[in-house]
């Protein structure tokens, strides 16, 4: 029924059972009779009846820019604004996992907000290299060293995003749908 869910997992099976209970209660007790009847007759489709009894959301746009720029709270712990691209990518995947475990359906994340963290990494690398080699190396060599480290961090950050999103599992046994 849902290709993002592994039906062999107990958490997925529990989610499916809860969904059937929710559909039944939604049909018998929560929806007006004419809506339930129209759904049964195929006149309309009442979407997400399997989650209707719960106060959770279907799909959202995560305000990742605000959460990264101003910090956020996850699991009762304050997460400060990242100081590098790699950390921003890691925090982004943690936010995606937390949101996915507390809703159903997909989520959208605007990755453009990660750009400023690449700039932070650039500035950090440049400062480190200038402090260590500033008067011993020409500026173009310093820039080349900074770019080499920056490209490695960019690659590692994107790899983190890909691996984490593809291997994370939510509480209902589903991979985040991003």
Briefly describe each language-model feature range.
Residues 1-178:
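Catalytic alpha/beta active-site cores
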């Amino acid at each position: 029924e849902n290709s993002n869910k592994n039906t062999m997992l107990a958490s997925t099976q529990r989610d499916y059972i809860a969904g059937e209970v929710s559909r039944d209660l939604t049909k018998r007790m929560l929806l007006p009779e004419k809506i339930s009847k129209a759904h049964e007759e195929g006149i309309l489709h009442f979407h997400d009846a399997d989650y209707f009894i719960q106060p959770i959301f279907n799909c959202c746009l995560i305000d990742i820019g605000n959460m990264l720029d101003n910090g956020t709270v996850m699991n009762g712990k304050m997460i400060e604004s990242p100081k590098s691209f790699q950390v921003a990518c890691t925090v982004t995947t943690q936010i995606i996992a937390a949101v996915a475990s507390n809703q159903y359906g997909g989520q959208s994340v605007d990755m453009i907000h990660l750009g400023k963290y690449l700039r932070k990494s650039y500035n950090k690398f440049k400062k480190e290299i200038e402090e260590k080699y500033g008067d011993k190396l020409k500026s173009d060599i310093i820039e080349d060293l900074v770019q080499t480290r920056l490209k490695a961090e960019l690659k590692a950050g994107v790899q983190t995003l890909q691996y984490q999103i593809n291997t994370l599992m939510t509480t209902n046994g589903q991979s985040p749908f991003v």
